[in-house]
Amino acid sequence: MAVIRDVMPAFELVQPSSIADAQKVLEEQRENGWVLAGGMDSFDWLKDRIKKPKVVVDLSGVAELKGIRTTTDGIEIGAMTTLTEVVQHSVIREKYKLLAESAELVASPQIRNQGTLGGNVSQDARCWYYRAGWPCYRAGGNICYADTPEGRNREHAILYADRCVAVNPSDTAPALIALDAKFVMRTSKGERPVDAEDYFIGPEIDITRLHILNPGDLLTAIRIPSTWAGAKFYFEKVRDRNVWDFALLNVASAMVVTSGSIERIRIAVNGAAARPLRLKVVEDAIRGKPPNRATGEMAGKLAVEGAIPLQFNGYKIPLMRNLVKRAIGGVEEA
């Protein structure tokens, strides 16, 4: 299939200065509108001419969407705050370093300087068939090219695949789920906060999107409660190269240990399914147990129950098992 690359289609550029103005344009344009944050995902789509919006709404001039603010119950991060700003913020590094660690492993320094937190959690699937313009399920077709005997599916899903086997590529998403963050959206009905884990969706809900934003909606901020401030955190990202690459799998956990036992825990993985997965079964099973190797072993086995590998990604099952094991029992050799 021939694709014209590096030649953007014509579009109208709108540069609002307020959230209200931005949302007004997005509501008017609906499916014809496109949100431009840092541009790390957007420009790939536009240059390859796979996405052809009529109106691009550039949010770089909306000051309300930028910055990190402490609140009475935690911290609020504007959706247009860059990943570098997240990594370097003193309060995040002190109290919520799980997010700083995950953001610091995104791509390269140059991309983190430009890319935003809102963009990282809202980026689209990286499946090469979908990205190359093939008429797959996610693009409105009637086949998943990756889920065929000869399909290139080494990086794809092992859990909860439903027609499409592409995975969510965000590094910060599992960290925000583990921190019990709220994603704040502005819709036609006003402000709508949702739990981080509910912001992401799989193909069983809508095969064309990885998140719940409808045309006309806008992600404005991410709020992290103080509930998990200073907890024991663990983040690990496995990728083919130690620079630049998207994750094959990643894991994030937040844990409070009292008298040698796990009192509270939240753990999430990404790269295993179309959405980041909070492992509630694992959380329930290990609560009250010591955070040691044996508990980690049990957690890892529970995490991969029901996993079904594709032709070329069977390695993800032991990888996910060991990542979860290390997130619970520390960094002992798996």
Feature names for model-found ranges:
Residues M1-A334:
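C-terminal structural segment of proteins
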